[in-house]
Amino acid sequence: MSHSSEQPLERVTIPALQQWKDKGRRVVMTTAYDAVAARIADPIVDIILVGDSVGNVCLGFDNTLPVSVAMMNHHLEAVARTRPHALLVADMPFLSFHVGSEDTIRNAGGFLQRGADAVKLEGGAKRIEMVRALVDCDIPVMGHLGLTPQSVNVMGGFKVQGRTTDTALRLLDDAHRLQEAGCFALVLEGIPAELAARATESLTIPTIGIGAGADCSGQVLVFHDVLGLTEGHRPKFVRAYTNGFQLFQEALSRWAADIRKGAFPGSEECYRLPDQLRHAVANWVPSSSTSR
């Protein structure tokens, strides 16, 4: 979906997402970890996720497990200051919702106080109690099933899920239990397209796919992946629409070359003294005290 930057954008709401699901309108979601990314993405997307993926995308970690609530608060506040029109969702990081309802509510409520419209948490049946506790406190919850990065050690790596009868049917059961617990949407990650399609058609709430085929109610990719800003292995489900890493390096290389050959800064990038001061500055001589 594309918007005109010249017209005020109507805020995206949770009821609007449900209406779009009912009408077959696809949802566009991406991540933002700072104000710059939020300002770039907001006129274009429907949902901005301040994801715990900030850990491996921006902070140099191998996975999302080291990301703390304090780290998430820092990045959420940066994005929230841009006052996006998009629905702003904050990830509940590892151990922020595993330690009891009271702490879960406190952590999630803190995200809403800092500008989030909703929170996202990973997991199926084991998270039902936490989802209900949050929804009972009027904290909107987006669920996340399939390849859940916080469970990477249990899963034995970043592997496609739902490829056996037991795991596929369990995912469908979990999806419906999360819907019944009050989730307003579900992220489906790293599962076969047919399984995601079955979940989407059987649920009343929207599904947002990432590596889950084309039949979900919407799609999400990491901002840096779409723009080609990440190095190394690229998951099969990622489509980069430009090579941002190379483009940025080329721009920096041109700038560095201009500095080294004396072409930057040019006259247009320099400030000038008023004519009446140039003579005084040019003829200034250090006094004996300043030359010591």
Curated annotation (Swiss-Prot):
Its main location: cytoplasm. Its EC number is 2.1.2.11. It is found in: Cytoplasm. Mg(2+) binds at D52, D91, E122. One of its GO terms (molecular function) is 3-methyl-2-oxobutanoate hydroxymethyltransferase activity. 3-methyl-2-oxobutanoate binds at D52, S53, D91, K120. Pathway: Cofactor biosynthesis; (R)-pantothenate biosynthesis; (R)-pantoate from 3-methyl-2-oxobutanoate: step 1/2. Pfam families: Pantoate_transf. Its cofactor is Mg(2+). GO terms for cellular component: cytoplasm. It catalyses: 3-methyl-2-oxobutanoate + (6R)-5,10-methylene-5,6,7,8-tetrahydrofolate + H2O = 2-dehydropantoate + (6S)-5,6,7,8-tetrahydrofolate. Keywords: Cytoplasm, Magnesium, Metal-binding, Pantothenate biosynthesis, Transferase. It comes from the Bacteria. GO terms for biological process: pantothenate biosynthetic process. It is an enzyme of class 2 (transferase). Binds 1 Mg(2+) ion per subunit. The active site is at E189 (proton acceptor). NCBIfam families: panB (TIGR00222), PRK00311.1 (NF001452). Catalyzes the reversible reaction in which hydroxymethyl group from 5,10-methylenetetrahydrofolate is transferred onto alpha-ketoisovalerate to form ketopantoate. Belongs to the PanB family. Homodecamer; pentamer of dimers. This is 3-methyl-2-oxobutanoate hydroxymethyltransferase 2. It comes from Bradyrhizobium diazoefficiens (strain JCM 10833 / BCRC 13528 / IAM 13628 / NBRC 14792 / USDA 110).
